[in-house]
């Protein structure tokens, strides 16, 4: 095994792919059941009403409605509420 670098070789050049974490649907947006709301590592946001949590702590909508962010007992939560009626 060579311990000197050969011609035009490098020991650098490796990096991991980005995980694309973060909020995917923001407050007030309407969503359908099954849509991903937040991708996260750990529970930065906790699931609220009509929101489920996946094995990797991803939050997703359990029902159609509007996204609402809030707090409960000092924890950030994400809820799905009935969409506001449209004014004609």
UniProtKB/Swiss-Prot annotation:
Q: Which residue intervals are annotated with compositional bias (Polar residues) in the record?
A: 7-19
Q: Does the keyword Ribosomal protein apply?
A: yes
Which residues pair up as cystines? none
Q: Which GO terms describe its biological process?
A: translation
Region of interest called Disordered, as start-end residue ranges on this chain:
1-25
**Entry's Gene Ontology molecular function annotations:** structural constituent of ribosome
Supply the alphabetized keyword list. Ribonucleoprotein, Ribosomal protein
What NCBIfam families does this protein's entry cite? L27
**UniProt-listed PANTHER family:** LARGE RIBOSOMAL SUBUNIT PROTEIN BL27M (PTHR15893:SF0), RIBOSOMAL PROTEIN L27 (PTHR15893)
Q: Which family does it belong to?
A: Belongs to the bacterial ribosomal protein bL27 family.
- What is this protein called in UniProt? Large ribosomal subunit protein bL27
